[in-house]
Amino acid sequence: MKDPNGVVIYEGTSQLDNETPIIVIMTGLEIASSNDKTGDMIQTWVILKDTPPHVAIKTGEDSAICGDCKYRGVYNMDTGVWDEERPCYVTVHQAPLAVYRAYHRGNYPAVTPKQVRHLIKEHRTGAVRVGSYGDPMAVPVGIWENLLKNSKRHTGYSHQWEIQRDAKAWQPIVMASADTELEAELAAKLGYRYFRVMPDTLQNKSIEVLCPASVEAGRKSQCAKCGLCAGTASHARKSVAIVQH
């Protein structure tokens, strides 16, 4: 029997609403990601346990894994159209839906925290993408702390940083996702490094660096090799900015 490409690392309640059952699936163990920007990274998918992701974005149930992220959009179930367009870059009927279906087919075995650490240690690159879909803060912070013990590099982003009480624990795990200069300033005051989406290339060069994997930066690196977006764990002084497309 072949080793699985994915495993279940969490089955429990969303930390965003404290009631909705969610799961976290770790994939990319055997098959490398084909994402040119990120490179070969272990992927982690935060999804609802009982509702397919392409359905959840329309019913609004995705709030249990995405919180109040403005990129969710608003779907009108009565008219069957989006009242507010969904600008999120994740195409949920592709990878997230495939992962959801594979989970319900029983393709992903559940693993212990010790096994998770071993899988990370033995991985080709040891690079982890925290929250390939879904906000990491929907998951208990201890799940990520364990996951990252043996990682070589990681990326992580959250739009829920303003409401998270245990900021000190999260700051080494995620970048605060900022959509305005004001949000970026607030995130920095709270102790987060941030990842700011900006309308042009006018980043504040004294405190921000242009994402090395972006087109504007000449695609100098990939996320799997870079390590800048690892929150305060990266020990980088500057935060990161990228041009919105």
Question: Predicted segment positions?
Answer:
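Class I S-adenosyl-L-methionine
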Residues: 1-245
